[in-house]
Amino acid sequence: MGSSSLSEDYRLCLERELRRGRAGVCGDPSLRAVLWHILVEDFDLHGALQDDALALLTDGLWGRADLAPALRGLARAFELLELAAVHLYLLPWRKEFTTIKTFSGGYVHVLKGALSEDLLIQSFQKMGYVRRDAHRLMVAALPPARQLVQVALGCFALRLECEILGEVLAQLGTSVLPAEELLQARRASVDVASCVAWLQQRLAREEEPPPLPRRGSPTGCQARLDLYRDVQEDEGSDEASLYGGPSPGPDSPTSELACQPRFWEQSARLWGAGGGPWEPAEVSSPTSGASEEEEPQPEAFSFLSLRRELLSRPGDLAPPHAPRSPEQASPPPIPEPPGYQMHTCLAPGALPALCCDTCRQLHAAHCAALPSCHPGHSLRTLRGNSQRRLWLQRAQVDALLYDSPAAGP
C-alpha cells in the first residue's frame, strides 16, 4: 500500500468520524493495524510520508537517560500535532484554530517538553502557521486540504513509531540505553524481534556508550491542555477544550492513575467522548518530607577524597581521648550515608555501567533489576573505563568501611 492510498484511507477515516460528531485524530483500528505492519517492516515509509521521523525522534530521544518516558512524551506531542492538522482540515472556518499560543497550554506543557523549538516551528509551518510574534503562531494562508491530511497522517505514523519503539524496549527488558543505538537497530531491522536481538547483542558486549548531553526530564501529566488559549482561560472555563473533554473534577482519578493505560492504546479510547485526555507518566518526584532528607549529589571518587573520608573517622584511626565531663561532651556525630554497593548483576571484577545514587548501587547496562529501580531514582551513566574502575574501587572500599568491624585503637 503506497503513501497516496494511506492518505486516502486516513482522510476517509477523519471524515467518517466527523459525521459521527467527532473531530479528532484517527481512531480506526484497521488502518492503525495496517500502518503498524508496514512501518515495522519498512522504516523508510516515513520518508514517503515526509514526516521527518529520523530528525524528530533523534531530537526527542537524544540525551535522555531513560527512553521509555521520553517515548511517551513524544507520542503525546505527535498526537497534539496531529490534532492541530486535523482541526485545520475538518474545521477551517473555526478562527480559534488559526492562532496558537506559544507561552502556555499544550505548546509549553507537551510540545516543548518533547521537541526543540526549531523542529516545532517547522512542523507547524507545514500546516500554514507562521510566527506572528514571540508569543503566537498564526495561519498566514491555509494549505491545500491534501497537504493537511498528509501532515496529520505523518504525525499518526510517528505515534505508531513510538509504539513500535516502546514494544522493542518492553521486549528488551530495559529502556536505559543510548538513543542512537535504538534508532540504528530499528532502521536496520525488519521486525520487532530482530531489533531486540540486535540490541541484546550490543548490550551483551557492554560497549562504552557515547557521551550524551544533559537534558531535562520530559514533562509529566498535565490536566486539560489547550494549544489555542491562555492558562487563565483554561483554568476559568468549563467549555470543551481542544481535546473535546471537560477538565477533570475532584472525583477524577489522580494523574498517576490516569497515566496507567499504555501509551499505544487506540486513539478511539484515548480521545473518546467523555474521556479525559491521556498524558504520559510523570517521573515520580520525592515528597516534601523526602526532599528534606535527600542527600547531596556525591562527588566523583578519588583516593584523595577517600583519604579525607578515612581521616574524618577518628574512632578508627586516632587514639582514644580521655573521657570528658558531661559539660564538655561533644554532640553526637552525624550518621554517615551508606556506602555504594555492587549489585548482584555484576560479576566479580566486572566494571559497572550505571550508578543509582538513590539505592547507592552500581549496575551493569543489561541489569534486569533496572526497570524496577529507575522510576524516580537518580540514575546516571558511567562513561569511560577509567571512571568505571574508580567507582568499582569506591564500592570495594565502601564495603571495607561499612561492612567490616571498626579497627581497634
Curated annotation (Swiss-Prot):
Family: Belongs to the SPATA2 family.
Name used for this protein in its record: Spermatogenesis-associated protein 2-like protein
GO cellular component, one term: cytoplasm
PANTHER family reported in the protein's UniProt record: SPERMATOGENESIS-ASSOCIATED PROTEIN 2-LIKE PROTEIN, SPERMATOGENESIS-ASSOCIATED PROTEIN 2/TAMOZHENNIC
Pfam family, one: SPATA2_PUB-like
InterPro entries, per the entry: SPATA2_PUB-like (IPR048839)
Region (Disordered): 233-257, 270-299, 313-337
